Amino acid sequence: MTQCPQEMITPGHGIIADALIMHGLIKILHIEGKMEGWAERRGERFVVCAERPDLNWIDQWEPMELLEIAAEFKAKGKDRASEEEEQRPYFGLVHDLSRSTVDPGNFSSWISDVREALYALKADFDLSEEHKEKRGEGRARSKKRGYYTLYLPLSGVYGKYVVENYGIRQSQYAVCATCFALSTLGYIYGTVKARVERRSSSGGGHDVFNLTFIPRERTSLRSLMALQRMAGLVEMRPGDLNELGAVVYMLSVGETIYAVREGVDILVWVTQRAGNFQRTVGVNIFRGDRLLEAIAEIKYRAPSWPKIARQLGSSLNVLGEYLAFGGDVYHVIRSVMADLGRKGGKLAGLEGLAEALKKIG
């Protein structure tokens, strides 16, 4: 890899927010053609070595138009009935973002905030070593002008209670325009989201499984950019998937990435909504290169696998455990067969799955 032109480091808002800030920066560097460089993890922060972005184009960027449309509708619709407000003309990346949120009541504010932060990004951009301390980011009783709430999908800390002087208070986690804009871009362009409606017997609401790739070792920006091709939203039927099962599902139905030969991990977190309650649970890190290689092998030997995966439920959890940690290949096949049988699915293609699992194991 080439010598580092400039070292930019994420501020330290937690591994979720920092991973998204890294991906937002990589997206911008890709647009500017500044992909000669690398990223690496340092604790829960990430270092990106590349030319500093100039951001002269950002006011004219196409996503800004989509954000403008959404913001204009909000302004015009203030006096409409609430049921009409729910049918906003969100499309493209804004639609996917709206389906990924677990806080729909604040979504229009998120859109307005990210639009404002993107306009400010050119003048505000700063990813220096002491960024967080210099900017005074973090918990605050009240937000300062030019600062933004780090909404729940972008972090695991939004809405938690803080103990202070033997009392308990709930305060927002405030960040600057750089952190807010880049983390939102990272969530849009660097994250696979899977929305699952929860059964009414479980209280209703929905979960969103979030998956992004992070470097386990020094990794080229081109490799991380290639993995961003998988980003987007998938809708899943109600089921009993855990984090690994959801990872297998998202990698199975999405684009197949063969080319990554560097050490990457998968960061997974789950955002949940039930009634007015929302939270982040299940933050995990899995070995990404192993899982990517395994799913690519399965798709190669069983071309119908994406269709099969869409029919499966809890057997994806069993498969995920096997792919991540090893185990009994026959137990996996039996579990998949039983799952398909319960759903009336066809068993064609399972021979290829068995061959792939034996090769992987």
Curated annotation (Swiss-Prot):
GO biological process, one term: defense response to virus
Keywords: Antiviral defense
Inducers of expression: Repressed by 5 J/m2 ultraviolet light and 50 mM NaCl, slightly induced by 20 J/m2 ultraviolet light, 100 and 150 mM Nacl. Member of the csa5-cas7-cas5a-cas3-cas3'-cas8a2 operon.
Protein origin, superkingdom: Archaea
One Pfam entry name: Cas_Csa4
InterPro entries xref list: CRISPR-assoc_prot_MJ0385
Subunit and interaction comment: Monomer. Can form a Cascade complex with Csa5, Cas7, Cas5a, Cas3 and Cas3'.
Function: CRISPR (clustered regularly interspaced short palindromic repeat) is an adaptive immune system that provides protection against mobile genetic elements (viruses, transposable elements and conjugative plasmids). CRISPR clusters contain sequences complementary to antecedent mobile elements and target invading nucleic acids. CRISPR clusters are transcribed and processed into CRISPR RNA (crRNA).
Protein's recorded name: CRISPR system associated protein Cas8
